[in-house]
UniProtKB/Swiss-Prot annotation:
GO BP of this protein: translation
Keyword field contains Ribosomal protein: yes
Oligomeric form and interacting partners: Part of the 50S ribosomal subunit; part of the 5S rRNA/L5/L18/L25 subcomplex. Contacts the 5S rRNA. Binds to the 5S rRNA independently of L5 and L18.
Upper classification of the organism: Bacteria, Pseudomonadati, Pseudomonadota, Alphaproteobacteria, Hyphomicrobiales
NCBIfam families: bL25_bact_ctc, PRK05618.1-2, PRK05943.1
Keywords, sorted A to Z: Ribonucleoprotein, Ribosomal protein, RNA-binding, rRNA-binding
Disulfide links within the chain: none
Name this polypeptide is given: Large ribosomal subunit protein bL25
Organism encoding this protein: Brucella canis (strain ATCC 23365 / NCTC 10854 / RM-666)
Pfam family, one: Ribosomal_TL5_C
Gene3D superfamilies reported for this sequence: Ribosomal protein L25, beta domain, Ribosomal Protein L25, Chain P
Molecular-function annotations in GO: 5S rRNA binding; structural constituent of ribosome
């Protein structure tokens, strides 16, 4: 599980575009805390802290504690909006969570031991079908990433979700099939040779 962190926040008494612009001028951005059958709570958080958390990776898989109005609220970032031109954060949605909360979260996939995959050594290409996997997982057990070992994989081999070790209590959100996460694809040169051989064989059969 990722290391948790603390965010200090202020309550927002005003909402709307004018209020949001004023917050940004003062180094803050608007945010909201929702969920757990409670009323949404409008807050303002540090622009700088959110910027580094978002661009540092793992933002949406790490539980945080927000300190606001004398309270400590455990949350999981669920969504954020960026400026379409400059990638600056403009708004964040936080979901209230507790030790008993079970959440849907997209966890990034990391691959290791590429050098130990014979298929890649022979020039095969790692074709990533899914860069992240949606899990249903306890909020206190969200992994930073799913590690996939490529050792021993040959050209044409695939990695399916059934081969991935998941944290205790976690299940994939997609349950109706053993979906593919990655394959070792043949290099373009090898594909061309195979196609040429196949064409030659067909021509020979047609004689």
């Amino acid at each position: 599980m990722s290391e948790t962190y603390v965010l200090k926040a202020d309550l927002r008494t005003r909402v709307g575009k004018g209020s949001s612009r004023e917050l940004r001028r003062n180094g803050q951005i608007p945010a909201v805390i929702y969920g757990d059958k409670q009323e949404p709570l409008a807050i303002a958080v540090s622009y700088k802290e959110i910027f580094y958390k978002i661009h540092g990776g793992g933002f949406k898989t790490t539980v945080a504690t927000i300190e606001v109005d004398g309270k400590k609220i455990q949350v999981l970032p669920k969504d954020y909006q960026l400026d379409p031109v400059r990638d600056f954060p403009q708004h964040v949605d936080f979901l209230r969570v507790s030790a008993k909360s079970v959440v849907h979260v997209n966890v990034p996939v990391h691959f290791k031991n590429e050098e130990a995959a014979p298929g890649i050594k022979r020039g095969g290409v790692l074709n990533v079908v899914r860069h992240d996997v949606e899990l249903i997982v306890p909020a206190n057990a969200i992994p930073e990433a799913l590690e996939i070992d490529l050792s021993g994989l040959e050209i044409g081999d695939s990695v399916h979700i059934s081969a991935v070790k998941l944290p205790k209590g976690a299940t994939p959100a997609i349950q109706d099939r053993d979906f593919t996460i990655a394959t070792i694809a043949a290099p373009a040169g090898l594909k061309s040779e195979e196609n040429a051989e196949g064409t030659a064989e067909e021509a020979k059969d047609g004689e």
